[in-house]
């Protein structure tokens, strides 16, 4: 039975699932999309990355996929057996996916120089026939999404101040433990935060890289998780 992950690791949600598969040592193949139509073909439910073929099912949404992986291969678990800690892990994962993610999106798509770099990065592995469509459609579409979400309406200095506060809060939550909530084993929360920090810490978003580099604790956290899932 082939397990196939559909998506590009430039997406923090694909990276989250990729690291989960590696953590559980589940062999898999990765198929990258060759254009926007592949997204709908690979994931007809939502048309987004990632999707996963697992045990004869086509799964979607990174949270739902990792939940299914925990059932497919329970060890190592992605949630603590302690219900209060597991609840905190689920909440942090959801916050990383639904809130922290948008800081990276604004930095990529609402700053012209970063948008140019982002499009170049996205297009380099796409067929030449698709690139003009991406260059034309993506900036306008994604920037409108960030404004509708709210963060895209903030002045850049305010956005970066808020991002800094969130990163400082993550350091407090991490504490002295190797992973969040003083656990020795990465959880679904760690995978989600790792994916979003990597999304911020990118050559296309120097502002995000500078923000993360202020916190050595977060860089060391990423190094630990990377070593366990490389």
Identify the function of each model-found stretch.
Residues 1-132:
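GST-like domain detector, emphasizing the conserved glutathione-binding G-site
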């Amino acid at each position: 039975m082939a397990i196939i992950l559909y998506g590009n690791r430039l997406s923090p949600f694909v990276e989250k699932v990729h690291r989960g598969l590696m953590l559980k040592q589940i062999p898999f193949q990765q198929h990258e999309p060759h254009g926007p139509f592949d997204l709908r073909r690979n994931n007809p439910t939502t048309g987004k990355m990632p999707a996963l073929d697992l045990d004869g099912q086509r799964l979607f949404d990174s949270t739902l996929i990792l939940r299914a992986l925990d059932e497919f291969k329970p060890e190592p678990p992605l949630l603590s057996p302690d219900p209060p800690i597991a609840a905190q892990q689920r909440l942090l994962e959801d916050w990383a996916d639904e809130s922290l993610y948008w800081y990276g999106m604004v930095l990529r798509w609402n700053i012209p120089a970063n948008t140019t770099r982002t499009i170049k990065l996205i297009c380099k592995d796409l067929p030449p026939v698709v690139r003009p469509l991406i260059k034309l459609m993506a900036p306008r579409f994604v920037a409108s999404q960030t404004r509708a979400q709210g963060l895209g309406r903030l002045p850049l200095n305010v956005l970066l101040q808020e991002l800094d506060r969130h990163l400082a809060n993550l350091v407090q939550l991490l504490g002295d433990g190797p992973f969040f909530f003083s656990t020795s084993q990465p959880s679904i929360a760690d995978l989600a935060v790792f994916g979003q920090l990597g999304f911020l810490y990118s050559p296309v978003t120097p502002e995000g890289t500078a923000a993360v580099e202020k916190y050595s604790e977060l860089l060391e956290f990423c190094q630990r998780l990377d070593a366990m899932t490389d």
